[in-house]
């Protein structure tokens, strides 16, 4: 049976790189949130600095996820699906903006439970260094917010909110090459028997 694997972590942790590498390794399908659909494109504009009420942004993410889940379920029929960000990002980022976690959970109650969540941990300093190489910045990319984001992710994992079927894999990416992190991900997925 094909697996639904989610990557999470603060900006600059290596999520996108590692999700794409894993999708290639497994001959699976890479996907991300926000998606490239109509709603996802609107979300990207808001994240780029366009004004939007925080509740509206949370609802946009939930709406984008409805479309995304239909796509994921269809793709899982034939392939593994590797997702770069998912409902956990909504729980983290929207709660930091002051939205009640119960509201976030309520508007995302339809979300498919992943088989495993891979959390890529990175120091704030390394995250900022890696993001310094990027051409564009988003509204959540500064030291104070990154610290809050990391703490929220740890709370979600420790409290087992929206717990994946096979739990969590935590990997620190500080001072490791892309290849070293990729090998560690493969090993831990094999240890959990997610992949053979």
Swiss-Prot record:
This is Probable thymidylate kinase. The keyword ATP-binding applies. Its EC number is 2.7.4.9. InterPro entries: P-loop_NTPase, Thymidylate_kin-like_dom, Thymidylate_kin_CS, Thymidylate_kinase. Gene3D superfamilies: P-loop containing nucleotide triphosphate hydrolases (3.40.50.300). ATP binds at residues 9-16. One of its GO terms (biological process) is dTDP biosynthetic process.
């Amino acid at each position: 049976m094909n697996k639904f694997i989610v990557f999470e972590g603060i900006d600059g942790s290596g999520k996108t790189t590692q999700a794409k590498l894993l999708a290639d390794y497994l001959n699976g399908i890479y996907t991300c949130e926000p998606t490239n659909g109509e709603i996802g494109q609107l979300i990207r504009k808001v994240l780029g600095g366009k004004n939007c009420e925080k509740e509206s942004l949370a609802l946009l993410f939930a709406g984008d996820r409805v479309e995304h889940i239909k796509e994921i379920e269809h793709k899982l029929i034939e392939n593994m699906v590797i997702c770069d960000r998912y409902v956990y990002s909504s729980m983290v980022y929207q709660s930091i903006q002051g939205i009640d976690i119960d509201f976030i959970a309520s508007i995302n109650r339809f979300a498919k439970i992943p088989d495993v969540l891979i959390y890529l941990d990175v120091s704030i300093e390394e995250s900022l260094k890696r993001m310094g190489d990027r051409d564009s910045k988003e509204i959540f990319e500064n030291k104070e917010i990154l610290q809050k984001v990391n703490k929220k992710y740890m709370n979600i994992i420790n409290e087992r909110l929206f717990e994946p079927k096979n739990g969590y894999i935590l990997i620190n990416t500080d001072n490791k090459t892309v290849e070293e992190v990729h090998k560690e991900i493969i090993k831990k997925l094999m240890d959990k028997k997610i992949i053979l």
